[in-house]
Amino acid sequence: MHNYYKIVLIMVAFFAVIITFSNIQVEGAVCNLKRCQLSCRSLGLLGKCIGDKCECVKHGK
């Protein structure tokens, strides 16, 4: 039972870190990464923000 609490604590800490860092935005960044990824995914590509531009690239590059 003690290991169960350790696992739950680790999971809670992990999600807290993920949520915290996902809310941090770089000042002055114009490219919306989530929107970029979604639009490129519809083309079967991977969306990446390079500077203020969204670029669609093949997976594995």
UniProtKB/Swiss-Prot annotation:
Consequence when changing Q37P: 97.5% loss of toxicity
SUPFAM superfamilies hit by this protein: Scorpion toxin-like
Presence of the UniProt keyword Secreted in the record: yes
GO cellular component: extracellular region
Tissue-level expression: Expressed by the venom gland.
Subcellular location: Secreted
Modified residues annotated as Histidine amide in this record: H59
Impact reported for K34A: 86.4% loss of toxicity. 100% loss of toxicity
Region of interest ([R/K]XCQ motif), ranges: 34-37
InterPro entries documented for this protein: Scorpion_toxin-like_sf, Scorpion_toxinS_K_inh
GO MF: ion channel inhibitor activity; potassium channel regulator activity; toxin activity
Main localization (coarse): secreted
Disulfide feature: C31-C49, C36-C54, C40-C56
Signal peptide feature range: 1-28
Keywords of this entry: Amidation, Calcium-activated potassium channel impairing toxin, Disulfide bond, Ion channel impairing toxin, Neurotoxin, Potassium channel impairing toxin, Secreted, Signal, Toxin
One Pfam family it belongs to: Toxin_2
Note: Toxicity experiments on mutants are done without C-terminal amidation.
Domain notes: Has the structural arrangement of an alpha-helix connected to antiparallel beta-sheets by disulfide bonds (CS-alpha/beta).
Family: Belongs to the short scorpion toxin superfamily. Potassium channel inhibitor family. Alpha-KTx 05 subfamily.
Known function: Blocks small conductance calcium-activated potassium channels (KCNN, SK). Has also been shown to weakly inhibit Kv11.1/KCNH2/ERG1, Kv1.2/KCNA2, Kv1.3/KCNA3 and Kv2.1/KCNB1 voltage-gated potassium channels.
Protein name, UniProt field: Potassium channel toxin alpha-KTx 5.3
